[in-house]
Amino acid sequence: MRRLIVTGIATSTAKGFRRVVNPNLLGGGAAARAFSDYREKLRTGFLHSIRFEDAFALFFEMVHSQPLPSIVDFTRLLTATANLRRYETVIYFSQKMELYGISHDLYSFTILIHCFCRCSRLSFALSVLGKMMKLGYEPSIVTFGSLLHGFCLVNRIGDAFSLVILMVKSGYEPNVVVYNTLIDGLCKNGELNIALELLNEMEKKGLGADVVTYNTLLTGLCYSGRWSDAARMLRDMMKRSINPDVVTFTALIDVFVKQGNLDEAQELYKEMIQSSVDPNNVTYNSIINGLCMHGRLYDAKKTFDLMASKGCFPNVVTYNTLISGFCKFRMVDEGMKLFQRMSCEGFNADIFTYNTLIHGYCQVGKLRVALDIFCWMVSRRVTPDIITHCILLHGLCVNGEIESALVKFDDMRESEKYIGIVAYNIMIHGLCKADKVEKAWELFCRLPVEGVKPDARTYTIMILGLCKNGPRREADELIRRMKEEGIICQMNAEDDHLEEHSSSNKEISLVS
């Protein structure tokens, strides 16, 4: 009966499995430290705290040992590597193992399926399932759990339910983990009523919901604005002696701050402390983000300083959130102080950090500082992206450096394969503002040749420029084209607020 699963699920054959990972993807020359005998490493607690580079070194020591280690030994290393969330590496190791003639067993196949699912490569996961069953291995409930998670990860909820039906027909009984996976997928798809029905089904079957079940449902209900249902769920959770954990509190706090209910979020934080649940980085990051969103920068900085005193130290996300908050409200020098502190504490600024600061200094007219940050970013080997270039382009335009903006724009077109309509909108808008409507019109007319399709914003900018400084005939022609393309409503909506929509904030929102 269980062979139903082969025909019902694993319709994808194992073709292409060996080609899924490029052997050069992770670099064969990864740093390898000298190990004592690999058996000693596997026997001790080394795997519990293994680092990525150590996993690589240990793997290559194992495959070059004589005799070769057993699949049980390799499975222990695969498990440890998967726990590091290095799923592609596990796939790479598995590929190498096959080349060395090391045969998989049920456990290693299950790990491989799990990693393919985590990488959203379901066709390969199903290929492995088919292969293992052809070799006589029956999948376990853990194997099916990984596949379920994979289906839910790519929003194939219908396929996930079909898999559960096949599991039941084949004699497998869904457990709490299976139900939790389905409930999570349903909540993320907005199917909360079905998720709640599954909770009732669990109770009827005598499967007690755990803290993960309730956390998932609470988050889904809150994000859908079903506050009364969420409150009822929380009461039911505590009534069943399932104590809220850090995930519960953090999820609720995050929802409250995003909804603008900051007072409720802070009350929940106090309740969290009173319940002896220690907030983590995610908790503090959510609170800081909410405070920054609503302009309460003093409170955000106070919370930032509070973290360390509570033994929870800021990470890159924390710094980026607060820097973004300061820059949003034009307090760029405060943002720069945090950037410098971040570097002193050993954190490497990422592309988001640099883009935020460059944008902030462009907004306050300190273009020279923005360009210096850009140069520093490149010197630190952080590669600028299209957003970085668009922010600088916009900064040059709004600060009257239109000739420099044209040079920048031409550089972007030469270096980027596709710069997109946003960059064109910024440049056309800058030219119109600088009374260079003819040049803007030339650029607009070049869009089809460049393979870039104008959007409502492009038409609006160009029509306004023509109405102010150019021939009305071309403006009328563009309005006619907008009607033909069904975007005249956008023009009407913006027509009453022309100055507002040509502001730097509105323009840059198209970039970020």
Swiss-Prot record:
GO cellular component term, pick one: mitochondrion
Keyword terms of this UniProt record: Mitochondrion, Repeat, Transit peptide
Cited InterPro entries: Pentatricopeptide_rpt (IPR002885), TPR-like_helical_dom_sf (IPR011990)
Boundaries of the annotated transit peptide in chain numbering: 1-34
Top-level taxonomic group: Eukaryota
Pfam families attached to this UniProt entry: PPR_1, PPR_2
Cellular localization per UniProt: Mitochondrion
PPR repeat spans: 70-104, 105-139, 140-174, 175-209, 210-244, 245-279, 280-314, 315-349, 350-384, 385-415, 420-454, 455-489
Family: Belongs to the PPR family. P subfamily.
Protein name per Swiss-Prot or TrEMBL: Pentatricopeptide repeat-containing protein At1g64583, mitochondrial
Natural source organism: Arabidopsis thaliana (Mouse-ear cress)
